[in-house]
Amino acid sequence: MAKDDVIEIDGTVLEALPNANFKVELDNKHVILCHIAGKMRMHYIRIMPGDKVKVELTPYSLDKGRITFRYK
């Protein structure tokens, strides 16, 4: 998949689920299931409920995403 195909959108973490999955409410009020990107997992960046995050979505599946950045 080319990097140009992703949709980036901001959201808020609602709930932490097992296996580093999270429920995230996007700015457009949709709730999706997300996992942490590999670089964030490698650097032990912790995600807690209430955190503002940047999420990447693919055009193929708009109900699953990848958390790529946690805002401070």
From Swiss-Prot:
Annotated keywords: Cytoplasm, Initiation factor, Protein biosynthesis, RNA-binding, rRNA-binding
Gene3D superfamilies reported for this sequence: Nucleic acid-binding proteins
Entry superkingdom: Bacteria
GO molecular function: ribosome binding; rRNA binding; translation initiation factor activity
Gene Ontology cellular component annotations, sorted alphabetically: cytosol
Localisation: Cytoplasm
Keyword Lipoprotein in record: no
SUPFAM superfamilies: Nucleic acid-binding proteins
The S1-like domain, residue ranges: 1-72
Pfam families attached to this UniProt entry: eIF-1a
CDD domains in the record: S1_IF1 (cd04451)
Subunit description: Component of the 30S ribosomal translation pre-initiation complex which assembles on the 30S ribosome in the order IF-2 and IF-3, IF-1 and N-formylmethionyl-tRNA(fMet); mRNA recruitment can occur at any time during PIC assembly.
Entry function: One of the essential components for the initiation of protein synthesis. Stabilizes the binding of IF-2 and IF-3 on the 30S subunit to which N-formylmethionyl-tRNA(fMet) subsequently binds. Helps modulate mRNA selection, yielding the 30S pre-initiation complex (PIC). Upon addition of the 50S ribosomal subunit IF-1, IF-2 and IF-3 are released leaving the mature 70S translation initiation complex.
UniProt record similarity statement: Belongs to the IF-1 family.
The protein's name: Translation initiation factor IF-1
Native source organism of the sequence: Campylobacter jejuni subsp. jejuni serotype O:2 (strain ATCC 700819 / NCTC 11168)
